[in-house]
Amino acid sequence: WTPQTREWDCARACAACVLGRRALDAARRRRSTWTIDLAGIFTAAGARGVMLVTKTIGVDPRLAEDAFYEEDYLRDVARVNAAFRRATALDSPVRVVRRRVRAGDIAAIVLNGAHACVALVDRRGLSPTETKSEGFEGHYVVVEDANVDAKTFTLMDPAGDARTKGRKIVTWSCFDDARRAFGTDEDLLFVSLRAKDFNVDAPRRFA
């Protein structure tokens, strides 16, 4: 578990939870990190099997009206759309797939053990008792484990309690509410953990 050190660096911390120090070496400290940026951090750290599953290719223009995004939106939109164009090229190390994914499918992938899963969520959705205000609080978590019978996920949360090393158990329905909130685009990153899918010469710097 790697805790985040600033309120905005959960993406970088999640990359370190999966790949360790090599991810920290590859990641630039950027206040605004989109999921396509996080995919770039993984590939810069040496991961070759990286897949971004999302319901929106590029930037959803409606996000310009959301308080969470508006401060960085104009600065980010051109960069993020360009990153998506590069990622959809035939020779890209990142595979981008436009689709929605069911909780049961996420559980099957995680339980297989061959891939790590990082999800973009509305942080407030992971705490059903928290009073929700208007808007969106984007946050990245690692889906560490799943229990199909109980229909629960074990999440590794970089903003979680140090006493549990950030672990938190949530129901599938709670997780679905958090990851399907407006602002997430239902983004999921699947990163191969197989040794053959890593470049031993990494990390390089991801800008």
Listing of model-derived features with the role each one plays in the protein:
Residues R62, D72-M156:
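Active-site-adjacent substructure of cysteine-protease-like catalytic cores
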Residues A67-V80, A87-P93, D187-V191, F198-F206:
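Core regions of eukaryotic protease modules
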Residues L38, T43, A47-A87:
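A basic- and aromatic-enriched beta-loop-alpha substructure that forms the phosphate/nucleotide-
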